[in-house]
Amino acid sequence: KQFTKCELSQNLYDIDGYGRIALPELICTMFHTSGYDTQAIVENNESTEYGLFQISNALWCKSSQSPQSRNICDITCDKFLDDDITDDIMCAKKILDIKGIDYWIAHKALCTEKLEQWLCEKE
């Protein structure tokens, strides 16, 4: 599913303030991480990242390429590619608990200031 900024804002509403992260920071980070696309897959040197939050099979989820993953979120990685982002959000909260928002490289580089543009402006 390809989300819009406003759709994603509604879906991520319960993360607003979680781990002291403001919603616009998260929306910005997800834009630069996956382009709001639940089917985004990025191959890295030693791991693959899945879905909206680009969750890695090295630590967080299990895939056929990563049977030795610690699988902290106790889930198969392909679950992060469907339209239901409930499980993605649960895993993202674990990542926020353990690693913080800077787990997503885009955050520090692109999403720490001028965040007004990431707010959903309701007509």
Swiss-Prot record:
Disulfide bonds: 6-120, 28-111, 61-77, 73-91
Record InterPro entries: Glyco_hydro_22, Glyco_hydro_22_CS, Lactalbumin, Lysozyme-like_dom_sf
Organism, as annotated: Papio cynocephalus
Glycosylation sites: 45
Full protein name: Alpha-lactalbumin
Subunit and interaction comment: Lactose synthase (LS) is a heterodimer of a catalytic component, beta1,4-galactosyltransferase (beta4Gal-T1) and a regulatory component, alpha-lactalbumin (LA).
Keywords on record: Calcium, Disulfide bond, Glycoprotein, Lactose biosynthesis, Metal-binding, Milk protein, Secreted
Tissue: Mammary gland specific. Secreted in milk.
Database matches in SUPFAM superfamilies: Lysozyme-like (SSF53955)
UniProt keyword annotation of Disulfide bond present: yes
Protein function: Regulatory subunit of lactose synthase, changes the substrate specificity of galactosyltransferase in the mammary gland making glucose a good acceptor substrate for this enzyme. This enables LS to synthesize lactose, the major carbohydrate component of milk. In other tissues, galactosyltransferase transfers galactose onto the N-acetylglucosamine of the oligosaccharide chains in glycoproteins.
PROSITE patterns assigned: GLYCOSYL_HYDROL_F22_1, GLYCOSYL_HYDROL_F22_2
